[in-house]
Amino acid sequence: MLKLLQQYEYKIIYKRILYTCFILFIYILGSNISIVSYNDMQVKHESFFKIAISNMGGDVNTLNIFTLGLGPWLTSMIILMLISYRNMDKYMKQTSLEKHYKERILTLILSVIQSYFVIHEYVSKQRVHQDNIYLTILILVTGTMLLVWLADKNSRYGIAGPMPIVMVSIIKSMMHQKMEYIDASHIVIALLIILVIITLFILLFIELVEVRIPYIDLMNVSATNMKSYLSWKVNPAGSITLMMSISAFVFLKSGIHFILSIFNKSISDDMPMLKFDSPVGISVYLVIQMLLGYFLSRFLINTKQKSKDFLKSGNYFSGVKPGKDTERYLNYQARRVCWFGSALVTIIIGIPLYFTLFVPHLSIEIYFSVQLIVLVYISINIAETIRTYLYFDKYKSFLNQYW
């Protein structure tokens, strides 16, 4: 084993995995440091909302320092992404320090709002009146900023950024779910298992299949018939949209509650229109998921920059003029790919959620299946990241000559 670790080809990947394990150890330790005892927490029956929070690295079963998870950070990234979407050139000219400060300031503001909402939603009223609510908010905000810092460090020195933290949070949430007795026939259970397997195959298809757009490469002078093509994944945004959409939905709910509580202190915490046991709440979440999936995919593809690269290199698409025509052509292709990928993921998540409205006695099992699907999707992305590092490590001695 020691000999294997000393091999130069895989030294970097092992260091990154070890660093990620250290980050996860801190996260697990912090998520077990309770601020409020379990007896002082309100019992909520909206189990999918708790599951949704866990998909952002949070936990509302107990109030701990990492209860908010990465939700405020993901929401701030969404807001900044949508603001910069219309002017990508200005966004690309910003320094990393400018982007960093904007993200952190916005994350801080959103953390305060979500902390206020979580305390009033999940902590007993008696405990809220007894304790110093501002001190509790300060602890939650500090924990969130620490977790964001850990995720940022893992992006630089570890594996797959915030995804390992979310993966551990989902596993922890799945282990806490109680499914001692399943009120369903063997045929229904078998159908659920088959549907989950089919869904996992579809997700694997989404990750592995790519759309290829052939173009004429002026630098390709080889005698072979090898074609050059522009490749995009079916869902360019990947699994990050699942975390971002949940984060946006939680922020929407907490933001509305925060604004209403300013004018009416006795406002009810339960908002039926934004709950997962109502068709309106599920529909709102799925619309957010679909729109964010599309816009994030378009943001990552960046057709405007790609058309400029084609203009500089002299490469072109057959029958398409360089410049504005190329940009319009790429926008047309990008819209098709991004809407298709976003709609496919939304349908995969939406069908089980709507199904819980018709068979509420199987809601826990269906929620468990949804979490399993999200877990596998995130695992595929993490595996893809590890494979990329292994690929670059394999050719490190060759690539070092050119950078």
Swiss-Prot record:
It is found in: Cell membrane. SUPFAM superfamilies: Preprotein translocase SecY subunit. It holds the Pfam family SecY. The gene is secY2. This is Accessory Sec system protein translocase subunit SecY2. InterPro entries: SecY/SEC61-alpha (IPR002208), SecY2 (IPR014269), SecY_dom_sf (IPR023201). Its main location: membrane. One of its GO terms (biological process) is intracellular protein transmembrane transport. It is a multi-pass membrane protein. Keywords: Cell membrane, Membrane, Protein transport, Translocation, Transmembrane, Transmembrane helix, Transport. One of its GO terms (cellular component) is plasma membrane. Belongs to the SecY/SEC61-alpha family. SecY2 subfamily. It comes from Staphylococcus aureus (strain bovine RF122 / ET3-1). Component of the accessory SecA2/SecY2 protein translocase complex required to export cell wall proteins. May form heterotrimers with SecE and SecG subunits. Part of the accessory SecA2/SecY2 system specifically required for export of possible cell wall proteins. The central subunit of a protein translocation channel. The chain crosses the membrane at residues 17-37, 63-83, 105-125, 131-151, 157-177, 186-206, 240-260, 276-296, 339-359, 362-382. It comes from the Bacteria.
